[in-house]
Amino acid sequence: MSIHSASPITRRKSRKIWVGNVPVGGDAPIAVQSMTNTETCDVAATVAQIRRLEDAGADIVRVSVPDMDAAEAFGKIKQQVNVPLVADIHFDYRIALRVAELGVDCLRINPGNIGREDRVKAVVDAARERNIPIRIGVNAGSLEKDLQKKYGEPTPEALLESAMRHVDHLDKLDFQNFKVSVKASDVFMAVAAYRLLARQIEQPLHLGITEAGGLRSGTVKSAVGLGMLLAEGIGDTIRISLAADPVEEIKVGFDILKSLHLRSRGINFIACPSCSRQNFDVVKTMNELEGRLEDLLVPMDVAVIGCVVNGPGEAKEAHVGLTGGTPNLVYIDGKPSQKLTNDNLVDELERLIRQKAAEKAEADASLIARG
């Protein structure tokens, strides 16, 4: 299959809901989201971080709202950003009611800790009145006490039962504008729980491996777990949970979707790990290009291969390809274009990539305009 091919994955059929102006589920692209890690009451810091996430491509951003002071701050934050905001609510249902008044785009609640059914109903009524979707967020670390007693420990079945308990509650209230997550820090538990849930409901699924770890370990866990589910067509929106800069969550999320041909944003680099055959410093070249070209949003493939063993083959499949040699050879759209020496290699390659990106953006826009 060509690297330019559409994804062979058939996605699970699900209802479409709207988080602000972002569709989730149905035939919508898989949305990538993150969560702020600033103090919500520090409005300036939170707004600054959300804007960085917007610049990185976040479709949706979640903000923790632990108390009423944070709820008031949330209202101020909402006025200063463009990306849809989800309010993360625990324990006090009145916080959900307040942020609903302040224009929240989605409410993330864990019905297990919101309290009595009348409180859940109050939240649902507020959401219905303003057409605000709800995310039922079930987590292995906060299962209801009766389920902990029944199962002895978190299991996929326990996560499913918790989720279905709350789905049934919303069904009884005739509320269908919701999505569901069943997260665990263990990859196999999370994957099994999502598979079970996908068979039970038609609502969109929010995927995540919770508390996955630091940048490296969390990326690996999330790529494995979410990759398994996404390859099966399961999942409508994703959040990569990392103990790192939230911007990294967006980058990793798009990289996972890129690798499965589910969604493209920016450059998809194909690069060799390098060996003694390399005719230029592949690692240094890649590091410099990735840093310099982060601002490019046009989906395109760039191959950086150090020698002629695999270089020509990979370069011919990319929009822009570099093959090491004496001198090095650049391919544009699969055809040899020009030779480059190692002098100013990165500068010249960056120039050619940006030139191709501009041409591709213009061609893509023209194609869309023609319908």
UniProtKB/Swiss-Prot annotation:
Supply the name of the protein. Answer: 4-hydroxy-3-methylbut-2-en-1-yl diphosphate synthase (flavodoxin)
The family database entries (HAMAP family) matched by this protein are listed as: IspG
Q: Which gene encodes it?
A: ispG
**The organism sits in which domain of life?**
Bacteria
Q: What is its EC number?
A: 1.17.7.3
Keyword tags: 4Fe-4S, Iron, Iron-sulfur, Isoprene biosynthesis, Metal-binding, Oxidoreductase
Q: Which organism is it from?
A: Pseudomonas paraeruginosa (strain DSM 24068 / PA7) (Pseudomonas aeruginosa (strain PA7))
Q: Which residues cross the membrane?
A: none
Any idea which positions bind [4Fe-4S] cluster?
C272, C275, C307, E314
* Protein's job: Converts 2C-methyl-D-erythritol 2,4-cyclodiphosphate (ME-2,4cPP) into 1-hydroxy-2-methyl-2-(E)-butenyl 4-diphosphate.
UniProt KW Ion transport keyword: no
For this protein, the record's Gene3D superfamilies field holds: Dihydropteroate synthase-like, Sulfite Reductase Hemoprotein, domain 1
